[in-house]
C-alpha cells in the first residue's frame, strides 16, 4: 500500500522494492513528528524539537565505509584505508537480503536535491525504515517543490536500514555495520547504524567524486557566509573545529555550514540544512544555533532529556560528546536563501591543534595555503567518530579525507587555481589549545576566535604588522582588538618555553613526514613550505 495523498513520485520498483507495506512518500515535518512519536523513535521536547537516540553508534563508523570496485569508477577512486574496495557480487547479495528484509515493512521516502546551484544539483532519493531519518533527510537536503516532484528521477538513491545487520563472514564487511557506495548502480546502502550523519556524508562523497571530474567544480568540506559588501568567506575544517560556530555570525548571512561547491560563478551550498555539534551550547556564545534547539522541526541527537518535563540539558554528555542538532537552514535568521554566493574574498582554514603550538591565527601565502589544505592538520575531536574519547592529532587531506573519493591532489589543484585567479586572502586559525597541549592548556575562547576571524575578514589584520614564526614560517599578527596580545603568539602562553620549542619541533616533523606523499604532486614552492 502506498500513501500518495501527499505527492506522487516515480515508483520504487526500479530499486527492487515491491513488497513494502505502507510507503510514506515525501511526508512533511508534521506527519513525520506524528510517526516518530507513534513508533517510539523519539520524544517531543519542551518548545518543540524532537529528541532521538542513535544507539551504539554516536558518530560515524569510519572503518565500515566501502566503495564497490567496478569498472566505471575503478581507475578514479583513491583506494586505501578511507576508500575501501568492496566486491560487486557481494554487494548484490547483501542488497538482495536488504530487499527481502523490507518485505511487509513500512518505509519513508524523501525526494530532494544535493546542491543549491541549478547547474550542478543532484536529485537524491532517500529511503528509510525510520521516520526520524526521513525527517533528517528532509532537513539536510534541498527540498524539491511540488512541481519538481512530478516525475522525479533520482540521480542517486540512499537506502538506510539501521535494524538490518550484515553477516561479516558472508558479506565481506568488517562488522555488522556497513556504508557502501556503488557508483555503477548509483546506489548507497547503509545498515547496522542509526547515526544519521552517515546519510549526508555518503551523498557528500558522491558529490566529491562527480563534481571535480565532470563539472570542474571544487567540492569543499567547509562553511561559508557573506558580508554586507558581498564579500564571501569560506571556512575549511573537520567536524568540531568551529565551521558551524564561526560561520553563524549575526553580522553576516550564512550560505551554509558544512558542504559547498565552488564553480565559475562562485560558491554554493550542497545542503538545505545544518548539522551542528551542540554539546555545552550556550545562548551567549552561540545564540543563533542555540535558538534552533528550541524549534519545531529540529532533531536533537543523543541529547539528555527529562522524560517528564521534556526539558533538555545541552551540557549533559552522558550519551556522547557528539550531541547534534539537525535543522533546516531557514531556522537560522540571517541566511542567503538561494544558498549561493560569489567568489571568496577570504579562506579560513580551521584546525584544532591538540598540542597547543599553532597560533590562534596566521596569514598564509598561496603556497602555504596549498600545503595546509593538503595536510589538513587537526585533531579528531571527542565523539565525532566512534571510539574517540579525547582529541588525537591527525592529518586529514583537504580537511575532509574521509569523504574524498578522488586523490587529494585533484582538489588541491582546483583550489590553487581558484585562489590565484581570484586573489583570495588565506588564513590558518587554531581553535584548539593554548598554553600547553590537551590536558595542560585550555581550549581557545570562542570570543577570541570570533574576534580574530572578524579582523581577518574585514581587512583589519592585513593592515597591521606581523612577526614570522620560527618553526612553521607563519605570519602572526602582533595585535587584534578584543584579544590579549600574549595570546597571539602561542609560545608566550606556555610556562615552559623549552617544552614549547620541543613540541613545536616535533609537530613540524610530523607535518614533513605526512607531506612526503604529496611532494611529487605539487610545485617546489609548496613542497618547501616546511
Swiss-Prot record:
Gene3D superfamilies: 3.90.228.20, Phosphoenolpyruvate Carboxykinase, domain 1, Phosphoenolpyruvate Carboxykinase, domain 2. Transmembrane segments: none annotated. GO terms for biological process: gluconeogenesis. SUPFAM superfamilies: PEP carboxykinase N-terminal domain, PEP carboxykinase-like. Keywords: ATP-binding, Cytoplasm, Decarboxylase, Gluconeogenesis, Lyase, Manganese, Metal-binding, Nucleotide-binding. Its cofactor is Mn(2+). Signal peptide: none annotated. It catalyses: oxaloacetate + ATP = phosphoenolpyruvate + ADP + CO2. Mn(2+) binds at residues 201, 221, 258. The keyword Protein transport does not apply. It comes from the Bacteria. Binds 1 Mn(2+) ion per subunit. It is an enzyme of class 4 (lyase). It is found in: Cytoplasm. Its EC number is 4.1.1.49. InterPro entries: PEP_carboxykinase_ATP, PEP_carboxykinase_C, PEP_carboxykinase_N, PEPCK_ATP_CS. The keyword Ligase does not apply. PANTHER family: PHOSPHOENOLPYRUVATE CARBOXYKINASE (ATP), PHOSPHOENOLPYRUVATE CARBOXYKINASE ATP. Involved in the gluconeogenesis. Catalyzes the conversion of oxaloacetate (OAA) to phosphoenolpyruvate (PEP) through direct phosphoryl transfer between the nucleoside triphosphate and OAA. Belongs to the phosphoenolpyruvate carboxykinase (ATP) family. This is Phosphoenolpyruvate carboxykinase (ATP). It comes from Geobacter metallireducens (strain ATCC 53774 / DSM 7210 / GS-15). The gene is pckA.
Amino acid at each position: 500500500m502506498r500513501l500518495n495523498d501527499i505527492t506522487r513520485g516515480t515508483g520504487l520498483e526500479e530499486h527492487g522494492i515491491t513488497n513494502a507495506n505502507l510507503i510514506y512518500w515525501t511526508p512533511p515535518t508534521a506527519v513525520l513528528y506524528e510517526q516518530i512519536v507513534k513508533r517510539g523513535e523519539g520524544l517531543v521536547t519542551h518548545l518543540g524539537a524532537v529528541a532521538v537516540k542513535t544507539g551504539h553508534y554516536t558518530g560515524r563508523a569510519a572503518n565500515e565505509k566501502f566503495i564497490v570496485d567496478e569498472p566505471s569508477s575503478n581507475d578514479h577512486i583513491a583506494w586505501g584505508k578511507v576508500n575501501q574496495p568492496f566486491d560487486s557480487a557481494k554487494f548484490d547479495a547483501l542488497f538482495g537480503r536488504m530487499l527481502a528484509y523490507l518485505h511487509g515493512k513500512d518505509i519513508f521516502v524523501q525526494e530532494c536535491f544535493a546542491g543549491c546551484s541549478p547547474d550542478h544539483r543532484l536529485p537524491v532519493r532517500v529511503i528509510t525504515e525510520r521516520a526520524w531519518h526521513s525527517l533528517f533527510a528532509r532537513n539536510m537536503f534541498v527540498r524539491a517543490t511540488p512541481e519538481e516532484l512530478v516525475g522525479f528521477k533520482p540521480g542517486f538513491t540512499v537506502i538506510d536500514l539501521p535494524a538490518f545487520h550484515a553477516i561479516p563472514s558472508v558479506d565481506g564487511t568488517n562488522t555488522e555495520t556497513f556504508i557502501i557506495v556503488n557508483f555503477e548502480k548509483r546506489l548507497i546502502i547503509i545498515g547496522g547504524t542509526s547515526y544519521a550523519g552517515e546519510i549526508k556524508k555518503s551523498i557528500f562523497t558522491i558529490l566529491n567524486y562527480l563534481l571535480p571530474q565532470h563539472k570542474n567544480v571544487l567540492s569543499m568540506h567547509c562553511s561559508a557566509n557573506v558580508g554586507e559588501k558581498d564579500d564571501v568567506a569560506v571556512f575549511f575544517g573537520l567536524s568540531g573545529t568551529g565551521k558551524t560556530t564561526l560561520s553563524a555570525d549575526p553580522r553576516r548571512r550564512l550560505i551554509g555550514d558544512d558542504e559547498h561547491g565552488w564553480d565559475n560563478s562562485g560558491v554554493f551550498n550542497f545542503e538545505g540544512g545544518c548539522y551542528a555539534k551542540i554539546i555545552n551550547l550556550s545562548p551567549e556564545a552561540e545564540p543563533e544555533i542555540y535558538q534552533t534547539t528550541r524549534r519545531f522541526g529540529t532533531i536533537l541527537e543523543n541529547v539528555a532529556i527529562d522524560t517528564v518535563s521534556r526539558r533538555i540539558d545541552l551540557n549533559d554528555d552522558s550519551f556522547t560528546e557528539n550531541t547534534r542538532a539537525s535543522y533546516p537552514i531557514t531556522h537560522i535568521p540571517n541566511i542567503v536563501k538561494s544558498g549561493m554566493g560569489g567568489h571568496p574574498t577570504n579562506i579560513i582554514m580551521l584546525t584544532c591543534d591538540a598540542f597547543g603550538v599553532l597560533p590562534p591565527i596566521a596569514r598564509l601565502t598561496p603556497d602555504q595555503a596549498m600545503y595546509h589544505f593538503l595536510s589538513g592538520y587537526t585533531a579528531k575531536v571527542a565523539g565525532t567518530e566512534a571510539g574517540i574519547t579525547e582529541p588525537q592529532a591527525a592529518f586529514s587531506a583537504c580537511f575532509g579525507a574521509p569523504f574524498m573519493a578522488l586523490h587529494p591532489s585533484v582538489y588541491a589543484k582546483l583550489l590553487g587555481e581558484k585562489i590565484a585567479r581570484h586573489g583570495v586572502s588565506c588564513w590558518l586559525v587554531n581553535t584548539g589549545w593554548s598554553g600547553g597541549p590537551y590536558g595542560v592548556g585550555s581550549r581557545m575562547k570562542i570570543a577570541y576566535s570570533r574576534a580574530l576571524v572578524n579582523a581577518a575578514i574585514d581587512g583589519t589584520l592585513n593592515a597591521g604588522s606581523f612577526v614570522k614564526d620560527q618553526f612553521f614560517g607563519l605570519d602572526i599578527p602582533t595585535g587584534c582588538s578584543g584579544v590579549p596580545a600574549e595570546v597571539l603568539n602561542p609560545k608566550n602562553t606556555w610556562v615552559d618555553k623549552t617544552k614549547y620549542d620541543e613540541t613545536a619541533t616535533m609537530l613540524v616533523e610530523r607535518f614533513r613526514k605526512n607531506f612526503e606523499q604529496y611532494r611529487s604532486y605539487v610545485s617546489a614552492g609548496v613542497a618547501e613550505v616546511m
